[in-house]
């Protein structure tokens, strides 16, 4: 036996071997099958030589898990997590451990995908429905979305909705009260500029002086003041103004709802419902509107429908509003949202129940009363006369107070005009109030918390005016009143989890979604308090660990992409598209070319591309694709020439959405550049580029990167995501800035695209760990293995299904498209039938009907083993045999295992099942693998039409759950 070297024994590549699914023997067998000698040989056969990198990445060597954890622990320790009283939309919260352990840290929840296949997603759909119910109850409005990205972007969406639905069609002014959070105003101004709206900022009561299509107010405002807007809202609505309100979710537990005051739209952050601050995110935003505006709502909405048996079933409702269908005509470009965080917030409400939430909110308000009473007793002047949790103070020696605060390791809010703000939260204790007295007043103030509390109890408090105290009940549905013990809560979460298929059960081969392993070691640091509990507006010298992590990650991404700079701020891929297009737009404006507003987009593009272009104020011109799925160069040349004087950019995905490396990609870039345009290369398929080629090397100017695809952040059932953009040097001055945090970059003066300066910074440690552990060679091998897995699946399935597009040497890139249209024509079996039948085999369906209707797009990723790939292939082969029985007439078109899929326990218990032309075993145990490890769909096929015609988006009677 040959002795191993010490380097081999140290196993620095162990994580790589665990991340990549096929072991060396499996890889060789697969290479032999596809006809390649090695991964390098296969790469040479697939990737055009003209765009292949000649040098390896300069990330460094791979490292072991323990080494990686030790390094990032050192970064975490550099963060100084002071007690935060900054507020401004971000607050300390206590994450219930039953939720932390069973949801946030549970792959059954965080590795699932957006519930496009609702029959195998009923658990998280119920949790999201609960989130919508919480949102509706607290805001007093009719219809809630399943989550938006953050409060500031929700404000921008509210402005867009207001313009769509306002009857004041000639108005072009959107009014923003001057006491909203500054980051919200920043994002709204950025979006308004793209739309050509005028934003007027002023005192709330001056809104009536303008001809408006919409207006935005903060409740409670940035200084803590609570205002009764009832009369103002009535006046504005009489003038056809759409009234939108940014509201604090915890305050709404005690306060009169904005809906009851007359608001049309209410939104805000659900962060303080059990989601850590995370240096800015991720957090779910709630968004609620009147029923009359339902068709103009942004984002996903969960609705109640029925399945084939007539039983209650949940699904995503009114999808025809969304980008994947309406493209540039969509209400918004929202794709990935914040479902995992919305679920956490909904479980927080379920666990505490209405009484628990009232206790928490009342405690926060009582501490604010005590703080205010003590300060006023000592002659301190307050800016606000009413409050829920925030006290704003004037007349203090700001420098002295700040010095004492820093010495006590606390952060207060310091405004430019000398106002000092203190925002309390769920984590506030008596000792914190005592410490605040010391910091604000200095020593020997003589104030006693207990005495002040007794005074308030005996005399009462007017911090919340009687007219603004909530009178109506909230969360009266039984779901919010029966799970207050941890035992019941744990079982409820588990019961919902068991209804959903996630990566911890089987491969999810969704094309263009890159459902790879989200390793436990990558997830671990996200829960650490040093990362989780930092306020995004903390002084940067307290966030040295975060800033170093962001700088290192940015440097790696620059190297991987071939760009010159990276902006981390966008908190989804679609937001990254928007941010990248804004950089292009501002670049043209800086050169006196503001008229360049046409965006060329191939007809095969992701739906977010045209939606984002529209969002950035661009006009979309669609270019054709040829029969091989490539961009039609002649059509591109013609259209680029036709619009040359106004050409802004092209948006193109690489490898293409058809799953091939287009040989002409550099020529495409050259054509656009020759006509004065910029090249936006969509990073959705970056998993086929890393280490082999790069957007910058190809010739692109800007790309977004889906960190929740290529770089291992989990999809969370529909979010969180991160969409940082890489840019060439000439675009770097035009990426997003931030009004609150300015780290000293040339782009600081630009408007923001997200509420927090670094977006959802709390999940960046995942991608940092992924890159650190894999190193240069590991990243490259991951890409090569993704190519191997895709070509293995393609070649195996090509014996049974037509493969629609192939590139050079008859290869595909990291995904393949099988064409079901001939089978549908011959048998009547649809792509939907096949997708639902895969549920019976224990699989989530591949991407349906994108980029070509009547097809399935399969992306296996590098993390799936040959064993799992073969299981999926066997399922598809078995389904093909089932289709043959329909073709031959053995099974009727309208009564067969595909048409009736998915099958549930209720099916096999049904005495009438015997009338079907196939057995119970064929229905639910169609393969040997399923017999030993069965996933049971809990509902039959859902009636989409019924759900949209009978729209109901709230919790249903408890009897329907039982």
Curated annotation (Swiss-Prot):
What Gene3D superfamilies is this protein classified in? Aspartate Aminotransferase, domain 1, Type I PLP-dependent aspartate aminotransferase-like (Major domain)
Supply one GO BP term: glycine decarboxylation via glycine cleavage system
Residues annotated as carrying N6-(pyridoxal phosphate)lysine in the record are 709
Q: Write down the top EC class of this protein.
A: oxidoreductase
Q: Which UniProt keywords apply?
A: Oxidoreductase, Pyridoxal phosphate
Question: Do you know which InterPro entries this protein is assigned to?
Answer: GcvP, GDC-P_C, GDC-P_N, GDC_P, PyrdxlP-dep_Trfase, PyrdxlP-dep_Trfase_major, PyrdxlP-dep_Trfase_small
EC assignment: 1.4.4.2
What this protein catalyses is: N(6)-[(R)-lipoyl]-L-lysyl-[glycine-cleavage complex H protein] + glycine + H(+) = N(6)-[(R)-S(8)-aminomethyldihydrolipoyl]-L-lysyl-[glycine-cleavage complex H protein] + CO2
Give the cofactors, semicolon-separated.
Answer: pyridoxal 5'-phosphate
Q: Name one GO molecular function term.
A: pyridoxal phosphate binding
One of the record's GO cellular component terms: cytosol
State how it assembles: The glycine cleavage system is composed of four proteins: P, T, L and H.
PANTHER family annotated for this entry? GLYCINE DEHYDROGENASE (DECARBOXYLATING) (PTHR11773:SF13), GLYCINE DEHYDROGENASE, DECARBOXYLATING (PTHR11773)
- What family does this belong to? Belongs to the GcvP family.
Q: What does this protein do?
A: The glycine cleavage system catalyzes the degradation of glycine. The P protein binds the alpha-amino group of glycine through its pyridoxal phosphate cofactor; CO(2) is released and the remaining methylamine moiety is then transferred to the lipoamide cofactor of the H protein.
Official protein name in the record: Glycine dehydrogenase (decarboxylating)
Question: Origin organism of this chain?
Answer: Shewanella baltica (strain OS185)
Lineage here is: Bacteria, Pseudomonadati, Pseudomonadota, Gammaproteobacteria, Alteromonadales
